[in-house]
Amino acid sequence: MSDKTMKDIQAEVDRYIGQFKEGYFSPLAMMARLTEELGELAREVNHRYGEKPKKATEDDKSMEEEIGDVLFVLVCLANSLDISLEEAHDRVMHKFNTRDKDRWTRKEEGK
């Protein structure tokens, strides 16, 4: 297991996609793929934590694998649109730390 930054992950995915003539799919096609992968993750969550058990004939996929699939497609989408996920993360955390700073009940420090 390595400590990869989001920048490292984006570069690794870009190198992988870059070896194929087809390159990145269109943003619309990647949104369809992302929706598909999110559906597969939702199915796993539902089977593990919901009321709907798997059929005996269904493969047992891991949550880690499904989250990895979602991450891969999200990175592809960001790369194709030239979006730094580190910068996007920083912006959203700033938003949460300012807009939502008093929205939730904070834990007492030291607990």
From Swiss-Prot:
CDD domains: NTP-PPase_BsYpjD (cd11531). It comes from the Bacteria. PANTHER family: NUCLEOTIDE PYROPHOSPHOHYDROLASE. Homodimer, or homotetramer. This is Uncharacterized protein YpjD. It comes from Bacillus subtilis (strain 168).
